Each structure stands twice: as structure tokens, then as C-alpha cells.
Amino acid sequence: MSEATAATVALGKSWSVYLVRAANGALYCGISDDPLRRFDTHCSGKGARFFHSSPARALVYVEACASKGDALRRERAIKALSKRAKERLLVGVPVLREVGEPAI
């Protein structure tokens, strides 16, 4: 375990994946160890270039993850979802399968 990782574990620093809704209705997905602070950064016009064309309007989803690596993997999975699937995620309906995907 690296010194930085040990310090993170000692401080109880946790990572989350989050979704922010932009003014145009688009959803932005990211990770942070402090989603509320990161949302404030997005709202202030700093942070992701995504919000240059349409400002951040609401932090609509936060999911705690066990590690930064887990948060990155979950972010990638969420970004791969269709807009419709992301919207279902927001209302708590699990995405079991996308249209066109083979049954597992």
C-alpha cells in the first residue's frame, strides 16, 4: 500500500461517482472525493469544460464507491449508458439490460 493510499484509508476518504444535470437537460458524469464541493466548482464556471456551453443546474445523483478505481470503473459504465438508461438510474430503477443487448 502506498503512503498516499494509507493516508487516504486513515482519513476515511471515500470516492463517489456523481451526475450533474446541465441547464440544457444533459447529464454530466464524474468522480470526486467530495461531490458537493465538486458541484460547487462546476456551478462557479470552473472544472469541466462540459459546462461552458450549458451551466450546471443540479447534482442529481451520488453513488459511493469503495475506492478511486471502483469509482472510475463505475463512471465508465455510467457514461456508456444511453440517456434513457441514465434517467432510469436517477429514479432508482436498475438498468438490467439495454434494448439490443443479449440476455445474460
Curated annotation (Swiss-Prot):
It holds the Pfam family GIY-YIG. Residues 13-88 form the GIY-YIG domain. InterPro entries: GIY-YIG_endonuc, GIY-YIG_endonuc_sf, UPF0213_domain. Gene3D superfamilies: GIY-YIG endonuclease. SUPFAM superfamilies: GIY-YIG endonuclease. Belongs to the UPF0213 family. This is UPF0213 protein PSPA7_1257. It comes from Pseudomonas paraeruginosa (strain DSM 24068 / PA7).
